[in-house]
């Protein structure tokens, strides 16, 4: 069996997280890394680019995704510091269950290479 690691934003996981129940039902070897910045990031990026500083309907109040994974019968851990990620990943792999790693990140960090502040600055610079 092949192991799978999936990366999902918090908004994405809120829309499709119920599929984790299927992963548990079929004992799939999957680890879902939920990157939680507390918003629908792509939509917010478009808002900042077109209407800097005007936020509408993109903020999220999220559940504890790690606890949700455990409630489904899987393995779940919350990761708040980068240094804690690799040990959590190893524990998830060793658990023998479908797993969710709930990673808390800065709301400004919109992608690996960009931030909301940089997007806003580009949009407001003539």
Segment roles from a protein language model:
Residues 1-126:
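Thiamine diphosphate
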């Amino acid at each position: 069996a092949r192991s799978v690691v999936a990366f999902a934003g918090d908004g994405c996981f809120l829309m499709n997280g119920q599929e984790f129940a299927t992963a548990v039902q079929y004992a799939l070897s999957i680890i879902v890394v939920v990157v939680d910045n507390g918003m629908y990031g792509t939509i917010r990026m478009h808002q900042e680019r077109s209407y800097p500083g005007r936020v509408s309907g993109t903020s999220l109040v999220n559940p504890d995704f790690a606890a949700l994974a455990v409630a489904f019968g899987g393995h779940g851990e919350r990761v708040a510091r980068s240094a804690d990620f690799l040990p959590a990943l190893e524990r998830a792999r060793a658990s023998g269950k479908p797993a969710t790693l709930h990673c808390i990140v800065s709301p400004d960090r919109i992608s690996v290479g960009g931030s909301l502040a940089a997007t806003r600055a580009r949009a407001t610079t003539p």
